[in-house]
Amino acid sequence: MKAASDPVIAVLNEVVGTSSVGAMVREALRRVLQQLETSAGQMAWEIIPLTAFGSSLPESIRSCWVFVIRAGAETGAERHPNSHQRSLSLTGSGIFELRGPDGWTPHPLVSTGSDATEQGWVTIPPATWHRLSVSPQAWGMLSFHTVAPEELIEERPVDPNDLDGETHQERYAGRR
């Protein structure tokens, strides 16, 4: 599905564009960038309480995260078997690749600050393999999920070359 045809993204884009939400997201992004700078990890994140959005989020949204991934990083394949993910590029750029029946499809994302939905957003249905390649600048994103933070599962292949083989699952919340 293209981001522009996802009705949930249309609502999220409007919510994120409000000045109060924008200020809160920028502050969270600043904290997560600092967290990444002081760690050795490939990425850092912070969970944004849904109360920060008031009552304007679609009912299906159960968690929101700010992620920052190191410059030049390649994340490898992962998927969330229990959540539909929608991500907005906040700073930097990169390529979100989604795995479909015909192989990997690239979705280049940039942080335009404009209303260009296809350039800034990606929609990832549950259990869809995805991987990221980050530009030479750290890439900050806002990700919305359809499960609560403590329920979000990251699944990775045991053998990166065999996406149909055995996988390893881990919950994001509580891990660092």
Spans of features found by a protein language model:
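A short, N-terminal "cap"/entry segment at the start of jelly-roll beta-barrel domains
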Residues: 1-61, 112-114, 176
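Short histidine-centered beta-strand/loop micro-motifs
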Residues: 54-58, 75-81, 87-88, 133-134
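Short, charged/polar surface micro-motifs in flexible loops or helix N-caps
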Residues: 60-62, 70-74, 93-95, 102-103
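Conserved short histidine dyad/triad with adjacent acidic residue
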Residues: 65-86, 124
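Glycine- and acidic-residue-biased ligand/ion/polar-headgroup-sensing regions
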Residues: 81-103
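Ordered hydrophobic segments in well-structured contexts
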Residues: 64-69, 86-89, 95, 140-143
